[in-house]
A protein has these predicted regions:
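N-terminal periplasmic "start-of-domain" segments of outer-membrane beta-barrel proteins
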Residues: 25-55, 82
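N-terminal periplasmic accessory domains that precede
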Residues: 60-63, 67, 86-89, 117-122, ...
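C-terminal beta-barrel architecture of Gram-negative outer-membrane proteins
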Residues: 623, 804-896, 911-912
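Surface-exposed, low-complexity loop segments enriched in small/polar and acidic residues
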Residues: 83, 112, 205-207, 213-220, ...
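C-terminal beta-signal and adjacent terminal beta-strands/loops
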Residues: 422, 704, 812-815, 862-872, ...
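Extracytoplasmic beta-strand/coil segments of soluble accessory domains associated
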Residues: 65-105
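Short loop/turn motifs that connect adjacent beta-strands in outer-membrane beta-barrel proteins
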Residues: 21, 156-159, 173, 189-192, ...
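Short acidic/polar hinge/loop motifs at secondary-structure boundaries
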Residues: 105-133
Length: 952
């Protein structure tokens, strides 16, 4: 929705080697070497501060989402996603493989997964963002596998800058957002020092799926019709056949309030209206920076970043979610007609089939607590990071930079209106309407057998349950780097320029933990959570040493204007859980410039990423995964073949489907199933090899073209099989021809009562972590930038300049294999439960800016190619199994009224394009929401933002 679609600026990438007459010494993202000029042997591009201002984002991730090299990550645009965190994913290899830096230094991760929340980056102070997509483990550390996003802040700011913006949709006038930033800076001691303070406040309203016609009703991805959750109202029930009981009432049945009878099929509950397309946000930021030059050899500096973001997300009302309770057949709230049916099913004699009888029935209950209202997840995220350092010149053109940094990220999550499993069980064990059989803790008998409204406020007050979860991450980083050249004694005779080198030492320690209240630590006790959240803690240390070299080989010879070599190596010692491992990362590459306007470049790198705290120490817990069709559901199997070896019916029985449920097993509730996953302390580092080759061409002044091919191969990847892999490995004859119980079948844990993957009695599908995976991607990046005066078009030069840019990404392959026994899944051009959100073959942004004096107009065209549902799986509705190419157009306008006052206007999704509709279970739980992919497509609509900036 709010993606700016910024084109990567080409000022960095487009300059040929050593083309400047004056050698400016700078440091380039991707290396710690300070070299003349701003050249890189790997693809590197920039987003300027002006581009960021023009698009008026309220969060950093917004202008990243539209970049060709970026893949939308789960974030604020996903219901029940990341607790308000905004992350970056380059090349689609995962947010944990993209390194985020501020001024070349690490930020503390917000989670145990090692991912940085970009909400903590102050937009008001951004000077430039460098995106390095060639791997940078040698320069910055093991986790820079797919690339680096380096946010460079303004230096030595003076004066006052007050910026504010307000935005809303043009049709419904909702999803409002307000942002205000105040920045103050001043020089000290005859300009020897500078201090800056920037504070900001952002408030963004949430947008519910019920606010859009395409999101208000949950749609079945197979049939296209309305669907929902089996946890419904009136309640749905099922129970196993008892001794002497009848075969009727298999499957799920619902009480008809008019007759009191159990009828089938049960009506599903629409969970969409209360869920979010966009999560609301209240964020407060404060950033302070200072530097002071003590002498020519020492400049002290310090930075402090503080962010407090509060997010209140909602989910559909809580309920019993298919848990089984021991309910007396004489529970007074059971209608007489339904009681009679249950007695027949269980074989209970007529004498006992009366109100007040204590004979227990194991009853699977699916009651939605609509009387309780929505579930709330309140997140309070606090990040504090401070850095102290010293830098300066050593002598002989060598410089140093030493710093220490500590960051803390703390999250408090409060769950409200979720309900207690134990209290529901106690309240259902009642023989009259006023007291429970176990009448402790103020127990109030619960009526789950009536229509909406049958649960009274007193009942709700008893069964209600809130929960508290705490998370803390602390990161300490100590770093020393020195760089310079080796002088004119050790030079190539064909170049005459010194070798530039950089040495760096770094020590990093990450300590992380979670804690929760007693209720949260019990499996299923907090209704609707699906998993316990036991306390956990872990830490790891890294000690690293690196060396980099830039070696000029040839200069100013025929067809060899410049040939340069770049080498680097990083040695890492990784320590965790009392064990240590040593491994290395390296890079080798160079450039050849035959003429001034043309430069070829290539780089090969090996990156080694250590597993993060979550991958190592996360406990094994039961969560949720999407699944539209259970291989054993409905008439796919039959009781006649239940004992016939080699049949699907027999295999379903052997993997946990009771014979009485064969032929009537319902579809997964809400299109979701239980999924057992967790960390693995035995994990080792994964290895990635990155290759890039390309060229930079400036055929004429102010026109630049870059073309780069990239290939990234990850071995020993930390990965886990998808639920689809496990289910196919067991039930699909392509992988299990004999339909016998195999290793995949051993990872399946069905509900012991009804055979589904839902309810507290089901562990679900196990997806363990290992180092057995592989992942690779390759493609081509093309960037073009051209600036021309309109006089070249035959117009008067007073009509200003046109800036044209085009950024294009063609992905050639995108494959992964989580284990050797899994299939190698090629997700390019597909979306599915296994592949996740759409994986585009092509993306491009075309941006045109027209500047006339104090006015500027901007036009941005964003394109993503068409995708289809991954073949070979569930037969989804054809209309949902294909998404055509999408085009978005954004506009912007700037008026510099005076030197002090600037006015901005931006319009995103000018044509008010609606998102593609795919239903609710065709993708993963995190990406497929509100019948679409809201992180990949605009689910909000045309959005207009007004802004103003005052400087003095």
């Amino acid at each position: 929705m709010f993606s700016s679609g910024m084109i990567l600026g080409m000022a960095v990438a487009a300059q040929p080697a050593f083309a400047q007459e004056k050698m400016e010494v700078v440091q380039v993202t991707g290396t710690r070497i300070t070299t003349p000029g701003t050249n890189s042997n790997s693809p590197i591009s920039s987003i300027t501060a002006e581009e960021i201002k023009t698009s008026q984002p309220v969060a950093v991730e917004e202008f990243f989402k539209g970049l060709p090299a970026a893949v939308p990550a789960i974030g604020p645009g996903t219901n029940n996603g990341t607790g308000g965190a905004a992350t970056i994913d380059l090349r689609g290899l995962g947010t944990n493989r993209t390194l985020v830096l501020v001024n070349g230094r690490r930020l503390v991760p917000y989670s145990l997964g090692g991912t940085v929340d970009t909400n903590s980056i102050p937009i008001a102070l951004l000077s430039r963002v460098d995106i390095f997509t060639g791997g940078a483990s040698v320069a910055y550390g093991a986790d820079a596998v797919s690339g680096v996003a380096n946010f460079l802040l303004k230096k030595n700011f003076t004066g006052v800058d007050l910026t504010t913006s307000y935005g809303a949709t043009t049709e419904e006038r909702d999803a409002k957002r307000r942002r205000t930033d105040l920045t103050i800076g001043a020089n000290l001691a005859d300009n020897r020092g500078n201090v800056v303070l920037s504070v900001g406040k952002t408030v963004a309203d949430p947008l519910t799926q019920g606010a859009r016609e395409y999101g208000i009703t949950s749609l079945n991805s197979v049939t296209g019709g309305p669907t929902g959750s089996g946890t419904t109202v009136p309640s749905a029930f099922s129970t196993s056949q008892g001794p002497g009981g009848t075969a009727t009432l298999s499957g799920s049945w619902q009480i008809d309030p008019a007759t009191g009878k159990l009828v089938s099929p049960a009506q599903l509950y629409n969970t969409n209206p209360l869920n979010y397309y966009v999560t609301g946000l209240e964020r407060t930021q404060a950033t302070s920076m200072g530097n002071f030059k003590i002498n020519e050899h020492a400049e002290a500096y310090a930075e402090l970043f503080y962010t407090n973001s509060k997010v209140a997300s909602t989910l559909a009302e809580s309920g019993t979610f298919g848990n089984t309770f021991n309910v007396p057949i004489g529970n007074p709230f059971i209608p007489a007609a339904a009681r009679q049916q249950l007695c027949e099913r269980r074989g209970i004699p007529a004498a006992s089939c009366v109100e007040g009888n204590a004979t227990v029935v194991p009853l699977l209950v699916n009651r939605r607590f609509v009387e309780l209202g929505p579930r709330y997840n309140d997140f309070d995220n606090k990040t504090l990071q401070y850095t102290m350092g010293m830098k300066g010149e050593i002598g002989y053109d060598w410089t140093y930079d030493a710093y220490w940094s500590r960051g803390n990220a703390d999250q408090t999550q409060t769950r409200r209106n979720w309900g207690s499993l134990a209290k529901v069980g106690q309240a259902l064990n009642a023989l009259n309407k006023t007291t429970c059989v176990v009448n402790t803790n103020g127990c109030v008998p619960l009526n789950v057998f009536g229509a909406a409204g049958s649960i009274t406020p007193a009942m709700l007050a008893y069964i209600n349950q809130s929960a508290l979860l705490l998370q803390s991450v602390q990161q300490d980083v100590g770093s020393l780097s020195v760089s310079g050249d080796l002088g004119d004694k050790l030079v190539s005779p064909f170049a005459g320029q010194p070798i530039n080198m950089a040495f760096s030492l770094e020590q990093r320690k990450v300590v992380a933990s979670t804690a929760s209240d007693a209720a949260s630590q019990l499996q299923g006790e907090v209704l609707g959570t699906g998993a316990p959240t036991p306390d956990r803690a872990g830490q790891f240390k890294l000690r690293e040493a690196a060396v980099e070299m830039a070696i000029p080989l040839v200069k100013d010879l025929p067809l060899m204007r410049a040939i340069n070599l770049e080498l680097g190596y990083r040695q890492t010692e990784f320590s965790s859980a009392g064990k240590s491992q040593d491994y290395g990362s390296w890079k080798a590459g160079g450039e050849w410039s035959p003429i001034q306007s043309l430069r070829f470049r290539a780089m090969a790198q090996k990156a080694t990423r250590a597993p993060n705290v979550n991958e190592l120490f996360a406990p094994q817990v039961t969560g949720l995964s999407n699944l539209a069709v259970d291989p054993c559901m409905g008439t796919r199997i039959n009781q006649a073949q239940a004992n016939t070896a080699g049949t699907l019916s027999n295999l379903c029985r052997l993997t946990g489907v009771p014979v009485s449920e064969i032929g009537s097993l319902p579809a997964p509730s809400s299109g979701q199933i239980n999924n057992l996953s967790g960390g693995n302390p035995a994990l080792g580092p994964e290895e990635a090899k990155t290759k890039t080759i390309g060229f930079v061409w400036e055929p004429m002044p102010k026109l630049a073209l870059t073309v780069d091919y990239y290939k990234i191969d990850i071995d020993k990847a930390v990965s886990s099989p998808t639920t689809t892999d496990i289910l196919d490995g067991c039930y699909n004859t392509a992988f299990n021809p004999g339909l016998v119980v195999n290793a995949s079948c051993g990872m399946i844990g069905r509900n012991t009562i009804n055979g589904t993957f839902n309810g507290n009695e089901s562990k679900g599908v196990q997806t363990p972590q290992s180092n057995l995976g592989t992942q690779n991607t390759s493609g081509v990046d093309v960037n073009v930038a051209y600036r021309l005066n309109v006089s070249t078009l035959g117009l008067d030069s007073k009509y200003g300049n046109l800036d044209l840019s085009w950024g294009f990404n063609q992905v050639q392959s995108y494959k992964f294999r989580p284990t050797p026994s899994s299939i190698e899944r090629d997700c390019l051009g597909f979306y599915s439960v296994a592949c996740g959100a759409p994986n585009y073959k092509r993306k491009f942004n075309q941006r045109t800016n027209w500047t006339v004096g104090d006015f500027a107009l901007g036009y941005n065209w964003r394109y993503v190619s068409g995708v289809i549902e991954e073949p070979g799986g569930t037969d989804f509705l054809p209309a949902f199994a294909k998404i055509d190419a999408f085009n978005y157009v954004d506009l912007s306008a700037v008026w510099n009224v005076t030197k002090m006052l600037r006015l901005n206007l931006s319009v995103n999704n000018l044509a008010n394009k609606k998102p593609p509709i795919v239903g609710g279970s065709i993708g993963t739980t995190g990406t497929d929401s509100g019948n679409t992919f809201p992180q990949s497509y605009d689910a909000v609509g045309r959005y207009i933002t007004f802004g103003a900036s005052l400087k003095f």
